[in-house]
Each structure stands twice: as C-alpha cells, then as structure tokens.
Amino acid sequence: MQEALNADAAEVEADAGCPNEPIDLDDVVRDAEDAAKQAESFKGAPGVVVISRYPAAGLREVNVSLDSDDITVKSADGTDVVIEWEAGCEGVEQPTVTLEEHTLSVRRANPDVFKTFFSVFQKEGGKVTVRVPRGYAADYVLSTTSGDIRLYAIDVDKVKVNTTSGDVRVEPDAGIRAKEIDVTTISGGATVSACAGDVVVSTVSGKQFVSCDANRADLNVVSGKIHAEGASEEWEISSVSGDAEVLCTVAPTRKIQINSMSANVHVALPGDIRGFVADISSMSGKIVNEFGPNRYGTCALPIHMDTMSGKLMLTRL
C-alpha cells in the first residue's frame, strides 16, 4: 500500500514539474492564507461603484445613516435613485441598502460601536453619493458622525441633516427647493445657500453662513457665530455667546426675533424699509439704533431684540 502511495506522490510531483522537490502541505496552507488576506485587503479599495439602483416612483423617503462617511445628494437624469459608494481607504466596509415601506435606507449592517465613538476624532470612512431624478420630491434624513454632508440642486419635501463634527453645505449652484430644511451640527460648520421654505439651523460651536430667501429662517447657536443674509419673510435668531449678523436684503413681512445672553447681534435693514415697531432691550450691553425712535415709518413690522450683556445694533444696510 505504501509503495502505491509513494508512486502516486511521484506522479503528482512529476505533473507539477518539480520531481525532485516534495510537496510541503504547510507551504500550501500558508500560501492559501496569504492569498485570502491579500483578497481581504482589497475589500473597499478606492473606486466608485454603484451599489444600488431603485425606481424613484413610489419612494417617499431616503434615509442615510453612517459614521465617518461623507454624504452627497444631487440631482441627475433618469428615473432611478442611484446609490454610489467610494471607499476612503482599504478595509472600509461597504454600506448596505434596503427598501422597506417606501423608505430607501443606507447604513452598515453591523456598526462597530467602538469605531463609531472614535470616528468623531478621525476621518476614515468613504463617500456615499445619492443621485435622484430631477423634479423628484421626497423626504431625506441624512446623518453622520464626522463625515461632511453636501446637497446640490434637488427637489425635496423635507430634509433633516445631523452631524457631530462634520460640515454641512447646501450648495449655491442651483439651490434646493424644499418645504423644510433642518440642519443640526455640534462642532461642524453649516452653510445653507439659495433655498426657500422653512430653514432651521442649529449648531453648538460651529459657524453658520445662511444666504437664502426663506419663508422662515430659524438660526440657533451656543458659542459659534452666525452670518445670515437674504430676503426671508421671518428671522428668528437665538444665541448664548456667539455673535450674530443678519443682513436683510429685503424688508421682512412678518417679524424679526433676536434672543441673546452675552452675544453681540447686528441687524441691518434695507434703506427703503417702510417702517417697523422695535422692542430693543439690554441689561448691561450697549444699544445702537440708527433709525432713532423704536417706532419708524408707517409699517408695523415687529422687531424684538433682547440680550443680557451683549451689544445690540439696528442699522441701515
């Protein structure tokens, strides 16, 4: 029996082209393990891939919830909602896409809690791009920990954006048409441009730049700064210690409401404003009103500005 086995082994060695070198099974196993590791290292390698494509008809909501990945939503030709993925580095797991009850969801199947926590301090994720048909309106819920979020020229009913340290940008190229935009970030910045509807932006230490002709602009900050401009019908600004500047290119039609603890707040009104009724108060801060009296002109636009120790300025644009 042993002679037969030796003969078979000799035939194998001869077929392998190395009759004088015996086969080392340990080497074969090691080679297989190395090949497996090498293949695993290519998972998530850089490069854009389409991971999902769904007909837009019937979809009511797109929900993207990731950790350190960047999220971009933009309009495109066609009738499908297309999800693209680009890995930021080797070994990054590709997110999964599911469809349930008219909601398209993009997330990782088994998020790593440890990685999620430390992703606040580092950027190792990839990039998810959602391409939606032009004129297609739905609700969008976008959230990430340290990734940036971008929105380009899309039609939406409502969009809710949340990030911890990432920046949020509603790009000004064509703006977005939305009934409601809600942006929340802690230390990241928020830039919202060329949009209408109701706009709500809340940051803790991040800076805000808002330039839009909104139905209502509600801007909230703790220690970050606010720069806002446009022809919004209603402005509501709330700040603890972060300074705020509001440049009204067109006189609001409803109201201006400013509440501050110690922040300096500057509101500039257009020179052709027909009038207003102002209630400006500060416990220890300075008040500057270039228009003179608290009642100006014939229009009764209500302006309320209140602070404890900050400086309040009402000037002409």
Q: How would you name each of these model-derived features?
A:
Residues 4-6, 15-107, 123-143, 148-162, ...:
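Short linear S-[DN]-x-LW-Φ motif typified by the pepsin-like aspartic protease active-site region
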Residues 49, 171-174, 179-182, 190-317:
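Short, surface-exposed interaction patches in beta-rich subdomains
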Residues 79-80, 112-114, 157-158, 177, ...:
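Short, surface-exposed beta-strand-loop junctions and turns on beta-sheet-rich folds
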Residues 88, 100-102, 109-111, 135, ...:
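Solvent-exposed coil/turn segments that connect beta secondary-structure elements
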Residues 95-96, 118-119, 291-294:
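Beta-strand-rich interaction surfaces with strong enrichment in secreted/lumenal proteins
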Residues 113-124, 261:
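Alpha-helical membrane-targeting segments
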Residues 159, 164-165, 178-182, 187:
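Non-catalytic C-terminal interaction regions
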